[in-house]
Amino acid sequence: MMAAASSPEKLLQLQEVDSSRAGSRILSPILGSSSPGLSHETSQPICIRSPYTDLGHDFTTIPFYSPTIFSYGGPSISECSSVHQSLSASLFWPSHGRVGTPITLHCPQGRSQQGQSAQTPWDSVITTSKSVRRRSQESEESMVSSGGKADLHYCAVCHDYASGYHYGVWSCEGCKAFFKRSIQGHNDYICPATNQCTIDKNRRKSCQACRLRKCYEVGMTKCGIRKERGNYRNSQARRLTRLSSQGKTAEPKGITGPAEGSLNKPEKPALTPEQLIERILEAEPPEIYLVKDAKRPLTEASVMMLLTNLADKELVHMISWAKKIPGFVELSLVDQVHLLECCWLEVLMIGLMWRSVDHPGKLIFCPDLSLSREEGSCVQGFVEIFDMLIAATTRVRELKLQREEYVCLKAMILLNSNMCLSSSDCSEDLQSRSKLLRLLDAMTDALVLAIGKTGLTFRQQYTRLAHLLMLLSHIRHVSNKGMDHLHCMKMKNIVPLYDLLLEMLDAHIMHSSCLPHQPPQQDSKDQSEVPAPLHSSAGGPSNTWTPSSARAGGESQ
């Protein structure tokens, strides 16, 4: 009051206002009648300059807006102490009949206050809203950087979407497989043009010579394999893990989910028959080419050389195909080896029938090798096997076998090949056998679903299922004939066998001659006589195993 009296301007102190004026003229927003701060201690006298009173100025309500109107995420006005103090009841006009302590309004500030930086009641709200907006922008930027196209790569050869980091560069599955075939086999490709063919997504198969040349130009090397490959699926999984961890850290500590234990240890859900068929279709190996043309006329040695070379290449892809069958790698290592050793020729023969179904009277061993009955007659004892294969292929053509049915039958041949070999009573073998039976049941359901898609009646579906299963017995019979013939060719030293093919042949003969009452010591002795480990792939040891090493690995586990 002393400072107000010393002011050159005339101030008027109001003690009481008419009730009709006080009810409609409010100088600040009303937070509520029960708002705290109505005590006399927080009230100050109100000083209004005389010109305002002389002119009869009309004081209308001053509007205050909530921060939420401006999209601020700060605290409410009632939670802010500075704003709450400035909006106390001391700013209101006194009600009629009550003489309250006068409130000071429009009072001139002292020099000490003028020197300080002016702070408004909204400073804390604006600061809070800015920090909230900054955190939201940072979270959006992190989400974009983690879940955007940062992990998307293109093939350096054909510019298709890359599936991973293969042979030293980012490449797609097609160019990776092509380069792998080229460095493993013959790569004496010849360009029909000027060695300047365009290699892109649509024309990458037009010229093998220019495609291989571009593979070397972009930096693909035989030894350029990373230990931790940049697989696109793994990067997606890591990205989802980061996003889930960010969501967990942003969640309040006091709030927990109802099934926190189930989230930490999720159970692997079983695949539906539809999903199982899709996975098996994706696991199909690529087409294999001999690259070199067969010299005519064909001889017994040249035909056997071509067939054994092709079979050795197919065995490499067969191992990779088997590992992609859902649930196969969950079996014991010994069972995985036994299954492949007992069914490899059956798998090759059903693939041969599938490729030859549209070519009556011929067997299509690969896209660049087809033989007729007359051409196969140059090999001693091969005509009988050729006729059996032609008859089985004719039966497949009569049944109009669909691709989904074919892949299911092929997987069933793999899983049903050594049902009678597991005679051990140890817990690990019994557990692996139970897994194998569950896999067979799932594969049978997938085959039934594939048959149901043909649009037949239920009775016709049952009949078709029986015909398809009876076809497997014919394939096994032809496989046994082919195994005996291949063993005779080996004993006569007509053609040198490759390492992987030789091991598979010896292992199959050993299993077929094994008696049920044979002691386990003798069995382990026979297993140790199998040839040395085989390195079938330049990409790594994923396609390499021996029966002896497999058993040693199983015992160590």
Curated annotation (Swiss-Prot):
<dbReference type="GO" id="GO:0005496">
    <property type="term" value="F:steroid binding"/>
</dbReference>
<feature type="region of interest" description="Disordered">
    <location>
        <begin position="513"/>
        <end position="557"/>
    </location>
</feature>
<dbReference type="Pfam" id="PF00105">
    <property type="entry name" value="zf-C4"/>
</dbReference>
<keyword id="KW-0862">Zinc</keyword>
<comment type="subunit">
    <text>Binds DNA as a homodimer. Can form a heterodimer with ER-alpha.</text>
</comment>
<comment type="function">
    <text>Binds estrogens with an affinity similar to that of ER-alpha, and activates expression of reporter genes containing estrogen response elements (ERE) in an estrogen-dependent manner.</text>
</comment>
<dbReference type="InterPro" id="IPR001723">
    <property type="entry name" value="Nuclear_hrmn_rcpt"/>
</dbReference>
<keyword id="KW-0479">Metal-binding</keyword>
<dbReference type="InterPro" id="IPR028355">
    <property type="entry name" value="ER-beta/gamma"/>
</dbReference>
<dbReference type="GO" id="GO:0005634">
    <property type="term" value="C:nucleus"/>
</dbReference>
<keyword id="KW-0754">Steroid-binding</keyword>
<keyword id="KW-0539">Nucleus</keyword>
<keyword id="KW-0238">DNA-binding</keyword>
<keyword id="KW-0804">Transcription</keyword>
<dbReference type="GO" id="GO:0030284">
    <property type="term" value="F:nuclear estrogen receptor activity"/>
</dbReference>
<keyword id="KW-0863">Zinc-finger</keyword>
<dbReference type="Pfam" id="PF00104">
    <property type="entry name" value="Hormone_recep"/>
</dbReference>
<feature type="DNA-binding region" description="Nuclear receptor">
    <location>
        <begin position="155"/>
        <end position="220"/>
    </location>
</feature>
<dbReference type="InterPro" id="IPR035500">
    <property type="entry name" value="NHR-like_dom_sf"/>
</dbReference>
<keyword id="KW-0446">Lipid-binding</keyword>
<dbReference type="GO" id="GO:0030520">
    <property type="term" value="P:estrogen receptor signaling pathway"/>
</dbReference>
<dbReference type="GO" id="GO:0071392">
    <property type="term" value="P:cellular response to estradiol stimulus"/>
</dbReference>
<protein>
    <recommendedName>
        <fullName>Estrogen receptor beta</fullName>
    </recommendedName>
</protein>
<dbReference type="InterPro" id="IPR001628">
    <property type="entry name" value="Znf_hrmn_rcpt"/>
</dbReference>
<dbReference type="GO" id="GO:0008270">
    <property type="term" value="F:zinc ion binding"/>
</dbReference>
<feature type="region of interest" description="Disordered">
    <location>
        <begin position="240"/>
        <end position="268"/>
    </location>
</feature>
<dbReference type="InterPro" id="IPR021064">
    <property type="entry name" value="ER-beta-like_N"/>
</dbReference>
<feature type="zinc finger region" description="NR C4-type">
    <location>
        <begin position="191"/>
        <end position="215"/>
    </location>
</feature>
<dbReference type="InterPro" id="IPR013088">
    <property type="entry name" value="Znf_NHR/GATA"/>
</dbReference>
<keyword id="KW-0675">Receptor</keyword>
<dbReference type="GO" id="GO:0042562">
    <property type="term" value="F:hormone binding"/>
</dbReference>
<feature type="compositionally biased region" description="Polar residues">
    <location>
        <begin position="539"/>
        <end position="557"/>
    </location>
</feature>
<dbReference type="GO" id="GO:0043565">
    <property type="term" value="F:sequence-specific DNA binding"/>
</dbReference>
<dbReference type="Pfam" id="PF12497">
    <property type="entry name" value="ERbeta_N"/>
</dbReference>
<dbReference type="InterPro" id="IPR000536">
    <property type="entry name" value="Nucl_hrmn_rcpt_lig-bd"/>
</dbReference>
<dbReference type="InterPro" id="IPR024178">
    <property type="entry name" value="Est_rcpt/est-rel_rcp"/>
</dbReference>
<feature type="region of interest" description="Modulating">
    <location>
        <begin position="1"/>
        <end position="154"/>
    </location>
</feature>
<feature type="domain" description="NR LBD">
    <location>
        <begin position="272"/>
        <end position="508"/>
    </location>
</feature>
<keyword id="KW-0805">Transcription regulation</keyword>
<feature type="zinc finger region" description="NR C4-type">
    <location>
        <begin position="155"/>
        <end position="175"/>
    </location>
</feature>
<dbReference type="InterPro" id="IPR050200">
    <property type="entry name" value="Nuclear_hormone_rcpt_NR3"/>
</dbReference>
<comment type="similarity">
    <text>Belongs to the nuclear hormone receptor family. NR3 subfamily.</text>
</comment>
